[in-house]
């Protein structure tokens, strides 16, 4: 038995256990519950540890359309092994993004793996606006 499994057995009574599909996850019992009715949206850079740090990425690539898109070779990992910047909504990778620069604006081009809802797109727009404020530039969001 590995050290990790021994440690898990010794501390499991102090951990919160959650089973999703056929995978068991453990976490702190002190982790606050997620805020209901509020999405989290992140524009992650290429090679972010959220994807690169795990061999099994099924939890963050769980959507059927996302898996089909990725398996087609069109997204996330390019043929040269480079990871594309991804958009993550509520923990799931739902598209890729890239930035281009015009004379006056940063243009964020979003490629969706599956059609995002109106609420998701509104939240993405808010994140893109904050991105522009951080870089002190106006932003334009283009959606593929």
Feature map (PLM): residue ranges:
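Long, charged, low-complexity, helical-prone intrinsically disordered regions
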Residues: 1-144
